[in-house]
Every structure is written in C-alpha cells, then in structure tokens.
Amino acid sequence: MGNTLGLAPMGTLPRWSHRREEPLPNPGSFDELHRLCKDVFPAQMEGVKLVVNKVLSSHFQVAHTVHMSALGLPGYHLHTAYAGDWQLSPTEVFPTVVGDMDSSGSLNAQVLLLLAERLRAKAVFQTQQAKFLTWQFDGEYRGDDYTATLTLGNPDLIGESVIMVAHFLQSITHRLVLGGELVYHRRPGEEGAILTLAGKYSALHWVATLNVGSGGAHASYYHKANEQVQVGVEFEANTRLQDTTFSFGYHLTLPQADMVFRGLVDSNWCVGAVLEKKMRPLPVTLALGAFLNHWRNRFHCGFSITVG
C-alpha cells in the first residue's frame, strides 16, 4: 500500500484576494475650504433685529426682517426662496432661486441650476435702487475626484473690462486636497493676475487648510473636541494692506438646554460672543451678542428674535 495523496477540492484552493481601493472623494468647492473653521466664529451683531420666517409650500418660503440700529436708519428686508424638485444632497436642491430686497429697492438675487449631473451654474445679481452693481456668472464641473470652476464677474464688452476667476481642486488622497486659484482682471489701462495655491488636510477630528499666493496667505485650523465643543484658529495676511490678523474661535453646544455659544478673540484686541437659545416648544430663537474692540475703544451689542 502506498501513501495516499489527498487532493483538496478545487473550490477550497486558496485564492489571492485583491483589495479593491476605494475611489477618491470629490473635494467640493474652493469657496468651502475654510467653512468648518469659519462656522465656529460668531457673526457680528449690532442693534435689534426681528426675523419672521414663513413656509408657504414645500418649494417656496419668505422671510421678513426688521433691523433697528444706532449706526443707521431702521431697515426692512424681504427675503424669498424657491427650491425645485431635484434634491442632489441634503443641502443641495435644484433649481434654487433666492432674492432679498430692502426698503430702498436694492436687490440681491441668486439663481442655482443643475445643467447636467456634474455641471452646475450660478448667476448672481446685485442692484442699488435702479443701478446695477454686480452681475456674476459661475460654471462648476464636479468630477469623481476633482472640481473645476470658472467665474465671470461684471463682464462689459463695451468698456472692455472683466474679472475672471478659475478654481481647481484635486483629491490626492482620501485626506489630502490640493488646488489653486487664478484671478484675472482687466479694464482700460490696467491688467493683472494673481495666483494662489491651496491645500487641505482632513483628519478624523481636525482639518487644516492653507491658501498662499502673491496677495497674501490664509491659514485655518478646525478641531472638534467632542459633540459639544469645537474650536477654530485662523490666520490672515494681506500683502497689499500690510496687515496680519490672528483669530481664535470657540463653539459650545448645550443640547439639553437648547443653547449655542460662540466666542472669539483676535490680535486686534477684539473680543466677542453670541449666545443663542431656542424657546421650545415655541418656534422662536433668541440671540444676544456683544463685541468689544479694546484698541479702538468700540463696543457693539445686539439682540435678535427669529420666529419660524
């Protein structure tokens, strides 16, 4: 009797398993590079503001705003927004039309369109009473792992003036994004361009972003300590104005009390804070803010009520 050779069935033979790499994500828009850090800082408040929001349908809503301040005359704003049926993400609905008009007749309007699955268009118009101030047209293409944007600002064929801005972002890895911005302006007797390079690194709990070019530098650092505490650090340098600013922001959420606190301290000796409180079960949000500039001896405080 000889040795018995046991052969394993073909189905049980070891196989080499090739791990398929996940595709790189889309880096988003160039304007959103510093958004996480900027959302930590409080918005400037001054005077008394009343905002009443009214949802008329699933597509249309309006808002009435009355603002009274010691720095100027009382003002009224009518804000309208229309959202279409095509929801690309929880925060993106197409088409979208937004308009804001004040008591003097000045208008700010914005139109967002989805021309194709990856191609978006935006038009922005701004008037001061009966005079056009700004008209801007954007085209954005979002690939699998890159975003390219071209913006035309105040194009005037007769006056031969235009502002062109080109953005490009590329995902290098799942955490690293690199890109740049090219700003070109032309008007009679003047022409120039500014190039800015950008980079963004996203970790599990923090995000670091840097823009640097001939016009200056902008760096930000965002850190999420836990579900309640977020901090942000921002540095801006402007070569034309020969000015630098360093800011520290703090964001605290108290879900049990329905309160949100935002504070800031910067290198210009400015200290500010805003406290928001939701008055449940009423659809009312109260906000109280104060800002003090020690260097210029200026103090501003504000109070707002938002209904709806």
UniProtKB/Swiss-Prot annotation:
It comes from the Eukaryota. Gene3D superfamilies: Porin (2.40.160.10). Residues 281-308 are annotated as: Required for mitochondrial targeting. Widely expressed. Higher levels in heart, brain and liver, very low level in testis. It holds the Pfam family Porin_3. Forms part of the preprotein translocase of the outer mitochondrial membrane (TOM complex) containing TOMM22, TOMM40, TOMM40L and TOMM70. Interacts with mitochondrial targeting sequences. Potential channel-forming protein implicated in import of protein precursors into mitochondria. This is Mitochondrial import receptor subunit TOM40B. It comes from Rattus norvegicus (Rat). The lineage of its organism: Eukaryota, Metazoa, Chordata, Craniata, Vertebrata.
